[in-house]
Amino acid sequence: MKKHLLLLALLLSGISPAQALDVGDISSFMNSDSSTLSKTIKNSTDSGRLINIRLERLSSPLDDGQVISMDKPDELLLTPASLLLPAQASEVIRFFYKGPADEKERYYRIVWFDQALSDAQRDNANRSAVATASARIGTILVVAPRQANYHFQYANGTLTNTGNATLRILAYGPCLKAANGKECKENYYLMPGKSRRFTRVDTADNKGRVALWQGDKFIPVK
């Protein structure tokens, strides 16, 4: 899932991460016991940037996800939604979930519009195209159900998420294939109703370990 989230974000941006505003992690999670989230963004360039931020709700964070309507207009709020970010400066963007307190996990796209300040000022006077100096970056925010039910099944190296909230799962230990070295590690996000088989770690070995996070709680599985 993490690979799909990264691919989605890169497809949205149309540019490489090294060329864009630093918006931190591609995917962010708001746990069921929290209604706020903070993301730090940084302008690592030598010129000021004009940043505008927009939110969209998605049917899924995967490649086939579609933009859908929010349950209420103020379901997810943020501040600031627009700012001028000086060269080499940072800013904290805060998100507030005010949607239904139900058993449904919700997914949002955070769209960051980044433009060089000098070009933005020129646009106001001349409206000239500045496509080469601007960027549109997409990241994902997952809001866990307010009534989270964490359940899973594990058998023969495969984890299945039978609950209603995304799990972060991992395996570590001896590599399944000698060509991969002696020690291997795998990390994935596992959405509700999905299964994942570990393919690099020999989970059948006595030294092979499987674990997961339920929100901030670490759970050993094997």
UniProtKB/Swiss-Prot annotation:
| Keyword annotations from UniProtKB, A to Z | Chaperone, Fimbrium biogenesis, Signal
Instruction: Note the superkingdom of the native organism.
Output: Bacteria
Q: What induces it?
A: Negatively regulated by H-NS. Positively regulated by IHF and EcpR.
Q: Could you say which residues form the signal peptide?
A: 1-20
Spell out the InterPro entries in the cross-references.
Answer: EcpB_C, Ig-like_fold, PapD-like_sf
Q: Which SUPFAM superfamilies match?
A: PapD-like
Q: Which family does it belong to?
A: Belongs to the EcpB/EcpE family.
Function noted in UniProt: Part of the ecpRABCDE operon, which encodes the E.coli common pilus (ECP). ECP is found in both commensal and pathogenic strains and plays a dual role in early-stage biofilm development and host cell recognition.
The protein's name: Probable fimbrial chaperone EcpB
- Per the UniProt record, the source organism is Escherichia coli O157:H7
